[in-house]
Amino acid sequence: MDRNHAARNSAPLPLSAAHILLPSPSLSSPAPSPQLRSLSCTTSAAATPVPVPHHCLRCCDPPPPPPPPTPSPSISLLPFPFSDGPRLALNPVIPDDHFSSEMDTTTGGALRCRNQHLFLLQPAGQNAGTGPAQKLKTDETRCYERRGGSQ
């Protein structure tokens, strides 16, 4: 009788279907396989929320927008009253209404007047802050002169 009792206690117990399908709460869950990781990365936002590992968030999120381009400090784009659109100005200190009707880019940013006299502008960044700023004024012929020491 003792031998039958011991045999019944040592025999494995039959497992029901519930024991086979449900994992034991004491066991730790295994790491997800690579297939599950790739599926969780490709799930759409409209689908049911799926827990996604942290490393998958980088492939799921859209890339951040590129930063806006920073303008160059030595060249500025000023509005010009010309028919062919805006042009680059080498000296951003001078207001746009002081420029002549044509810019000659072959002379390093010089302004060309209607009587073909050239007046060079001081490029930005060279000798900045040393002496009075060079300003241009207009006369009746729409030609521009550089102001000297006397105004």
Curated annotation (Swiss-Prot):
Biased composition regions of type Basic and acidic residues, renumbered to the chain: 136-151
Task: From the UniProt entry, list the residue stretches annotated as the region Disordered.
Answer: 123-151
Q: Which UniProt keywords apply?
A: Transposable element
Provide the protein name. Uncharacterized 16 kDa protein in middle repetitive insertion sequence WIS1
Q: Which organism is it from?
A: Triticum aestivum (Wheat)
